[in-house]
């Protein structure tokens, strides 16, 4: 399947917009065919986009959003309220095994190691009960700029 860069970009934009705005990745049973219908493109085209343009499979794409959702939940202190498995399920993972596998693949660390490191770097969160995702992103941006000076 040959697509122009513009066509591929349009499909990818529609796909990302759908995932972000609808938070479709939270559906543990989300199927590629459902996503294709939702964004108005045929399933075979979506398959080609994953293979040739995004260089990852459908489930890796969806799981990348789920991992980011988990990290956001940790930044909001939700790991203090829920078990690891419950939090993973709330982020769209169907099983503990698939969660651990995906998390390690995208972060290079286990969820437990990530939480320990996060708690070590952000001890104030124990007092405040977490921060919003927006503040978390802002703080990371400031830290990144300081490190590059």
Predicted regions: what is each one?
Residues 98, 107:
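Ser/Thr-centric signal marking residues that sit
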Residues 43, 95-97:
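The DNA-contacting recognition helix of HTH DNA-binding domains
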Residues 115:
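Short, flexible helix/strand-to-coil boundary loops that buttress conserved ligand/catalytic motifs
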């Amino acid at each position: 399947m040959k697509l122009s860069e513009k066509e591929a970009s349009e499909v990818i934009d529609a796909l990302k917009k759908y995932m972000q705005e609808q938070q479709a990745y939270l559906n543990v049973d989300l199927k590629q065919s459902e996503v294709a219908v939702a964004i108005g493109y045929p399933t075979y085209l979506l398959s080609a986009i994953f293979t040739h343009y995004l260089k990852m499979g459908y489930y890796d794409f969806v799981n990348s959003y789920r991992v980011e959702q988990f990290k956001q939940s940790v930044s909001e202190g939700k790991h203090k309220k829920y078990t690891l498995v419950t939090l993973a399920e709330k982020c769209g993972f169907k099983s503990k095994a698939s969660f651990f596998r995906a998390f390690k693949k995208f972060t290079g660390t286990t969820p437990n190691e990530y939480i320990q490191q996060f708690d070590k770097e952000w001890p104030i969160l124990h007092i405040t009960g977490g921060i919003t995702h927006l503040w978390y992103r802002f703080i990371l941006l400031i830290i990144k700029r300081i490190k590059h000076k």
